[in-house]
Amino acid sequence: MLLLIIRHADAGDRDPAQWPDDTQRPLSDKGRKTHRRVSRALGRLELVPELVLTSPWIRAAQTADILVEERKLDRPPVPCTALADTPELSRLADDLGKPPSGAVVAMVGHSPWMEELGAILLGGSATSVRIDFPKSGVLGIDLAELAPAAGELRFLLRPKQLS
């Protein structure tokens, strides 16, 4: 399986006056535009997920929606509460199920949890690998199973590389 770990697109600055519940903060116009460009580039690179799991937080869900819309995927994003917290592989594995070995799966979530998930899958712990992961960045990891240190780094794509 190729796992695409995607950090949500830009959602502007945290503003407790406007968004007292930060889980409800939406993407900015800049974030929407950038992620549309990233999603189109993934298609050009033939990195089209069969399944998209997303944090239920609004900005992550909107990022996942853009990916599904731009890639014209058959299935809507699947909300996954495990992506809105410190990564627990057992919870993620339950939500993921058993995809075919050649499947491409995307997980959309938040910093620092997406960086920690990548580090766990590549190096065995959340601090084993430092990953500088920009908004709308895409980390590609080849995996046979969702387990610590089971992954092999395939790429880290930054939005600026995908114009």
Provide a role label for each language-model segment.
Residues S125-E152, P159-K160:
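Domain-level recognition of soluble alpha/beta enzyme cores
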Residues D29, D94, K98, E116-A119, ...:
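Charged/polar, solvent-exposed surface patches and flexible loops
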Residues H8, A82, L143, F155-R158:
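Active-site donor-binding loop signature of nucleotide-sugar glycosyltransferases
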Residues T34, P112, G140:
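Short, flexible micro-motifs
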